[in-house]
Amino acid sequence: MSKKRVHELGKQLKEQGIELSNQELVEKLHALGYLEVKSHSSSLEDDQAHAAYEKILAERKPKPAPVRPSGPGFVVRKRAHVEPPTVTAPAAPPPAEPEYAEPQYAEPQQAEQAYEPEPQEAQPEAAPEPVAAPEQPAEAAPLAAQAAPSPGAEAAAPAAPQAQPAQPAAPVAPPAPSAQPSAPQPPAAQPRPPQPPMPSRPPPAGYRPAPPPGARPPMSAAPGAPAQPGAAGQPPRPPVDPRTLRPTSTQAVVISRPLVPVRRVTPPTSARQQFPVAPGPRALGEVRELKVVPGSLGREREFIDVSRDKRRGRQPGRPISEEQAKSLSGKELLQAAISDRAYIPIRGKKKKPTKKGAKTQITEKAEHKKVIRIEESISVSELSQVMGVKASDLIRKLMQMGKMVTINAQIDADTAAILALEHGYTVEKKGFEVEEFIPEVEVDESKLVIRPPVVTVMGHVDHGKTSLLDAIRQADVAAGEAGGITQHIGAYSVNTPQGPITFLDTPGHEAFTAMRQRGAQVTDLVVLVVAADDGVMPQTVESIKAAKAAGVTILVAINKVDKPQAAPERVMQQLTEYELVAEQWGGTTIMLPVSARTKQGIPELLEYIALQSEVLELKANPDKLAAGRVIEAKLEKGRGPVATVLVEEGTLRVGDALVTGVHFGRVRAMMNERGEQVDNVGPGYPVEVLGLSGVPVAGDEFDVVEDEKAAKEVAQHRATKQRQKELGGVKKATLEDLFAKAKTSGQKVLNLVVKADVQGSSEAVSQALEKAATKKVGVKILESAVGAITKSDVLTAAAGNAVIVGFNTKPESEIENIASQQGVKILMFGIIYEAVDRIREEMAGLLEPIIKEKPLGKAEVRQVFNIPRVGQIAGSAVTEGVVKRAGHVRVVRDRKVIFTGKIGSLKRVKDDVREVAQGFECGIGVDGFSDVKQGDILEVYELEEIRPSLD
């Protein structure tokens, strides 16, 4: 079931003409029972949202008002329930001025009568028959249902009868005529809009206070009727224009509020309470009539006590004379109408003081704000937050597009643009411009100088690559290498008669493929060394492919020609299979016979290298910012990260800020291959650099930038992209992956933590160990890094139940003790193939051993002896092989095995022996079996464990 957000519900209500702010809508939903709604971004189920929409629409949608009569001076007023009063004629002639009598209100019997709306068209009723008065026809006045009874009639009316059960409100009958004919009375003025009481303010000019009871003349029954002379012959009162007393729209709304009768259930009034008492608190049982009006200053609500006006013998809010009305303003008229009223405020809930701020409004974003700027990718969660859309909707749309993603998955800019377009957004790419920090400099031919050639020596292991370089450099590097093989890539600068040459020595072992590939990528020329007595080998072919892939020139040096088994022609023939044809045979490849031991052919080799460099026209600009490639990297204690770099362009100086991969730093020191510190290095020379923030990856490019801040920004940008790629990559499961997972479901895995001296060795060892995995046992590298073995490595291995493999590195102090406490095994190696062989043994140890039964001999039971405290002993004669004390035994009777166990004791005469050979007699005790009988055969054997094969 889909969901709908609160602000979407607000938009639907707005279309229906109901405008609610987000806060008001949330409060309204809380009042309806949806307490889980927290803000305008919260979601509701479709059925819940529809139900809330219908409730709010039914409550807030204005209903058509009933047709009410209108006219000048008339105000529509609602009453809860009004009983028609019984009018009687006065027993004596009225005084000079008729007085106001307090109207009598019917009291409810049990409960307050429910309010029912009056009908739109009310039919007038006939007035009840007056007592002791001449019967005259009562003419119904217009809108009699809304007209109030005259004060004169109220004065003569007896107590009203008890209220009947709730019935529809009937129109009030017009007052009956009295002894003296009276003119029609104007309608009683309705209550005015409430205002806060102002006791300290003096009455307005021209306002006459209310007269005492009996001092006012009766009011006319009909509006606008001429006034009649009083009983004492006083002059008639001038008619009052109703338009002068017509209330405003605000007053009409307030005046139209219903009166709320309030009753307290108390004991009957005693005789003492019937006499006047001093002013003070009202006695219990008093009935007060209250009116609900908006509170002063618009706060909460208030009750107006209108009982005080009734006790004083006048109607609340009675109209004033025309002369007084002319001298008062509208505001003074309103104050006069509501004066002398008692207010009973409702105590509201005290609100905590909060900062007054603008309410959150549902608005539409401007067009310039509907632009999403992203780099190469963005996560689904970030895109949903920017657009204000549910992430589940975006994931559903991506699934329809055929992309299985999660909320944290990264999507490219094109896919994000498609999703954004559906919601009215546009996507702009704001890719990180690396060129701003690493600008490309135009080549200035006038500043180019000749640089030394970079020559990489490649070939199979033990074919004499390092020995050949030693002969050229007149050094003895090969003698100090572990196992006599090169396991690091070495960079050397050699001064020859033909000029300086930079040599890169690469390993020949199969595990160092990545090193050979890096050497081929940075070189200008490849010297392929092939042993004359061994010929072309697998790593020779691999080196040829790497050189051709890099597009560099290959020069073949056929080494070890001084050996008796040397066959240079056979080597040249084998190389033709790989499209390397010697110049002697009409080809283009230079092939020279050399000998590292006798230095035969070395001068010719150097001359050909110089010749090829001249043909290639190797030049570079030394005045620009330096750039190059990382050849090797390592972590040394006391020196930190150390990178061997090859400068390809520009000049690298101490203090330069450089960036390589995700690492950056400032050059603190530089040293050449002889360990001498240098201040600057030109193009074509190798050097060791100190000062980086971490160990870079061998093969990465490095660039010098203006300052360290720029280098840090570039490195952080690359690190962010790498992390996004690792976390947000979407990998589709293929059928082959499922089959591979099913095959390896029962496979055992050997976890390893690899630490090496340099980055290249760490990479090579990890790849070699991973290749050692078989179908029965797999290999998983938990961590591969450079540097000494630390406590962190031990804890990582302990958590992953792994073995630590150290290659040309040693553990720190007390690390071995911590490893023994944690139960972690540390294996140290200096030669890579020794590490591979030892790890295969560890892999075989994970397999369950195979138990094999090996027969030893047989013995026949001749006699059975029962020895106290020892048990049953079978006197037997060894008929085949030998019976050993530590062997297992099967008891066979009638060619059926009835028991299998171990030999408990073996004696010859009275001496304990370890074994008894064939032809001798002995006593054999079987553990856990005491039912040996004469004639049983005891078959003795032993169990041996056989380690299973990894293949």
UniProtKB/Swiss-Prot annotation:
Entry-linked Gene3D superfamilies: 1.10.10.2480, P-loop containing nucleotide triphosphate hydrolases, Translation factors, Translation initiation factor IF- 2, domain 3
Region (Disordered): 58-255, 305-329
Region annotation (G5) ranges: 595-597
Residues passing through the membrane, by range: none
Keyword Zinc in annotation: no
UniProt KW GTP-binding keyword: yes
NCBIfam families attached to this UniProt entry: IF-2, small_GTP
Function, as annotated: One of the essential components for the initiation of protein synthesis. Protects formylmethionyl-tRNA from spontaneous hydrolysis and promotes its binding to the 30S ribosomal subunits. Also involved in the hydrolysis of GTP during the formation of the 70S ribosomal complex.
Protein name per Swiss-Prot or TrEMBL: Translation initiation factor IF-2
Organism: Anaeromyxobacter dehalogenans (strain 2CP-1 / ATCC BAA-258)
Gene: infB
